[in-house]
From Swiss-Prot:
Principal subcellular localization: secreted
Physiological role: Snake venom VEGFs may contribute to venom dispersion and prey subjugation by inducing vascular permeability and hypotension. This protein induces vascular permeability through VEGF receptor (KDR/VEGFR-2) signaling. May also induce angiogenesis through VEGF receptor (KDR/VEGFR-2) signaling.
One GO CC annotation: extracellular space
GO molecular function (one): toxin activity
Free-text tissue specificity from the UniProt record: Expressed by the venom gland.
Organism of provenance: Macrovipera lebetinus
Residues modified as Pyrrolidone carboxylic acid (Glu): 1
Record keywords, A-Z: Disulfide bond, Growth factor, Pyrrolidone carboxylic acid, Secreted, Toxin
Protein's name in the database: Snake venom vascular endothelial growth factor toxin IC1
Length: 13
């Protein structure tokens, strides 16, 4: 499973 970077994760969170 490929998870997005912290930056993207916070944006989609």
């Amino acid at each position: 499973e490929v998870r997005p970077f912290p930056e993207v994760y916070e944006r989609i969170a």
